[in-house]
A protein has these predicted regions:
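The substrate-binding groove and active-site-proximal loops of carbohydrate-active enzymes
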Residues: 35-46, 70-84, 135-154, 218-236, ...
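Active-site-adjacent "subsite" loops/lids of carbohydrate-active enzymes
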Residues: 101-164, 181, 192, 196, ...
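Hydrophobic targeting/anchoring helices
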Residues: 60, 65, 71, 113-115, ...
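A conserved amphipathic helix/loop scaffold
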Residues: 425-429, 434-440, 444-449, 455-642
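An active-site-proximal structural segment forming one wall of the substrate-binding cleft
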Residues: 141-176, 234, 244, 383, ...
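Aromatic-lined substrate-binding rim segments of carbohydrate-active enzymes
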Residues: 53-57, 69-125, 241
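Boundary/entry segment of secreted carbohydrate-active catalytic domains
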Residues: 25-57, 63
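Bacterial N-terminal signal peptides
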Residues: 7-17
Length: 642
């Protein structure tokens, strides 16, 4: 063969092989991925600020494909809303010219009397406000069942929708039952009590209803009735708004911004009644924005807790809801709050928890010069965007796997505990503390559909109904601590299980089985401040309880968060690794389940700003052993398993 022909042929073969490897490592499915910038009213009202923002978008193109304008939040004046809507319409067109889609967010009931700057213009004169269980009345947070208030919402939302024709209108996370300061919960006003009595054929006053909710002694489930009634109150607000929007802007979809209220049991288990009302009125599938605080990264591990909070919210959504825009919040939007790198790490972590989109509240207050926001935040996010989008596309159709920190759907009807304060049953911190084990590589999947097993603390055990407890402990793998075991004994649940000798290789644990194949492991505590030998022992105990089905085990000593993604068959699809320590993390050994040599899989390590690295595993039966390369302090990457 002629030398030149040989070289040409060889280059062609290498190029083909390279393309095949690239295709194999990055092959994805369609996704709903978007990066979104959230705004406040000044961004459309102030023409100078608007111009600066438009220029920032030109400087860093293809970073955000959508913005959420914000309706006025400090007034009930329709004249003020009309002026604002006119300015928003102009701004919407200007952003469309940059191929950036305008959407809109607006408040509903009000976060609290002082949250929206305590404006006197927010105090209603034509309808009543929220009254809580103790008779505390808000000044500026609105009762959701007041006809004139609903008429106001109908007119206001229709005004903005007609002028701007937004892609989505988002109802703010003040559409909630609890925390409308100074009111602890809604709504015990005369209107709501009267309608509740009419619906259920009762004659409660506020005082007698509160007493019955506290004891929950009747057979008709007053707590459940009141929660359902409260959820219907919120859904009624969403229905009125959705109907008015659809009338003037039929292509506009609705969205709900919600926060993590699985701790606030009066909220109910999910927000699906609101989403259902939105879809019924518009005929369009709504969108979700889960969130829950974490306003600065001064204590960066809090992003992990927020991530797991959002994972639980996401799993409770109707499966038809695919647009899930995680809240990345920088309130008060100071340079001293969130770091650019922190925003990027947070972004991938929330995608790993199940979000499909990212919404950034990082410029809202305009407290810093727009040029600073752009050159600091926009620039870094633009650099990370391909990395984030690839993850979202690759992992579409999968969800986090591992341990489900289980909370009963019926936790709210648990019995009152001795010495418990009034209305102590309306909140729970079940399983919060044990999530700190995630910093040591324990994979969690709150409310996961494909969880390997369950993990519960004493409070979670207290919230189980008898039938539920019987079913779970007879059929599932469960990890609990001694405090939870004491609750089980007190409730007679220990009789469901038979003790067995501690399996070889495990220490400091009591093990039990059931006649139906359940496994229960009881450990002293969920303390995360432990030496590595105890960490590995605890992981092995957890794996035994899961019948050796944990999708991934971090075998190296590291302070790292491990998030496996599994498909509908429970097959491992990817693993995200977050170094949640200050120090550089040396090679990290991961044991990947169900990835035996016969699968002929490839393992590609991905990190922002660096070339992909194909890793070569060792095999032990159906397990692949992978060494993840060095990972810097507070950095994140992910392993694609093809």
């Amino acid at each position: 063969m002629h030398p030149r022909l040989f070289i040409t042929t060889l280059l062609g073969i290498l190029l083909f092989a390279s393309c095949q490897e690239s295709k194999q490592s990055t092959e994805t499915t369609p996704s709903d991925f978007k990066m979104i910038l959230r705004l406040w009213p000044d961004h459309h009202n102030d023409t100078v600020l608007r111009g600066e923002l438009l220029q920032a978008m030109r400087t860093y193109p293809n970073t955000f494909e959508e913005v959420w304008f914000c309706a006025e939040i400090q007034t009930l004046s329709m004249d003020a809303h009309r002026k604002s809507a006119a300015a928003m319409a102009v701004a919407s067109q200007q952003f469309r010219e940059l191929v950036i889609t305008p959407s809109l967010q607006a408040i509903t009931l009000g976060h609290g009397d002082s949250f929206e700057n305590g404006s006197e213009d927010l105090v209603p004169t034509e309808w009543s406000t929220i009254t809580d269980a103790n008779g505390i009345v808000t000044r500026a947070c609105h009762c959701p069942r007041q006809p004139k208030y609903l008429a106001y919402l109908e007119e206001t939302y229709a005004l903005y929708a007609e002028k701007c024709q937004p892609a989505i209108i988002w109802l703010d996370d003040d559409l909630r039952v609890t925390h409308h300061s100074p009111a602890r919960q809604l709504c015990f006003c005369d209107t709501c009590i009267s309608q509740f009595n009419e619906q259920y054929g009762r004659t409660w006053s506020r005082e007698t209803l509160v007493e019955e909710l506290e004891t929950n002694s009747g057979e008709d489930g007053v707590r459940q009735q009141w929660i359902a009634f409260s959820q219907e109150s919120l859904a009624g607000v969403a229905r009125v708004i959705s109907r008015s929007v659809h009338r003037v802007s039929p292509k506009t979809r609705m969205g709900l911004q919600h926060t993590n209220f699985h701790r606030e049991l009066l909220e109910g288990r999910d927000w699906n009644l609101i989403f259902k009302a939105m879809e019924e009125e518009t005929g369009l599938v709504p969108a979700s924005r889960p969130g829950n605080g974490f306003y600065s990264d001064h204590a960066p591990r809090e992003m992990v807790m927020k991530g797991y909070d959002m994972a639980r919210q996401i799993r409770r959504l109707d499966p038809d809801i695919k647009e899930i825009a995680a809240e990345i919040e920088g309130y008060r939007h100071y340079a001293s709050g969130k770091s650019a790198h922190g925003l990027c790490v947070e972004s991938l972590l929330y995608l790993s928890m199940g979000a499909t989109q990212l919404s950034y509240a990082i410029v809202c207050s305009a407290s810093e010069p727009m040029e600073w926001y752009a050159d600091t935040y926009f620039k870094k996010l633009q650099e990370w965007r391909p990395f984030l989008e690839e993850y979202a596309r690759y992992n579409a159709g999968t969800e986090p796997g591992g341990w489900d920190p289980y909370i009963s759907p019926q936790h709210v009807i648990r019995e009152k505990q001795p010495g418990e304060p009034p209305f102590g049953w309306i909140t729970t911190g079940a399983n919060d503390a044990l999530l700190h084990l995630s910093y040591l590589g324990f994979p969690f999947c709150p409310d996961g559909n494909h969880a390997s097993a369950l993990v519960m603390d004493a409070e979670a055990i207290s919230g189980l109904t008898p039938d539920e407890a019987s079913r779970l402990f007879q059929q599932k793998g469960i990890l609990i601590n001694t405090q939870a075991w004491e609750i089980m004994q007190r409730r007679g649940l220990d009789t469901l299980l038979t003790p067995i000798p501690v399996p070889e290789g495990l220490n400091n644990v009591s093990c039990f089985v059931s006649a139906q194949g359940g496994r229960t492991a009881v450990i002293p505590s969920f303390d995360a401040s432990i030496p590595n030998s105890q960490r590995m022992n605890l992981l092995q105990i957890a794996d035994w309880a899961a019948s050796h089905q944990l999708p991934v085990i971090m075998e190296s000593m590291a302070q790292a968060v491990v998030v496996p993604r599994v498909d509908k068959k429970g097959q491992l699809h990817s693993v995200t690794l977050l170094n949640c320590s200050i120090s550089e993390q040396q090679e990290t050994r991961l044991r990947l389940r169900g990835c035996g040599a016969d699968k002929k899989q490839t393992f590609v390590w991905k990190k922002a700003g660096q070339l992909d690295v194909t890793l070569h595993p060792q095999y032990e039966g159906e397990d692949a052993i992978i060494a993840i390369p060095t990972l810097e302090g507070w950095n994140i990457g992910w392993l694609a398993i093809n």
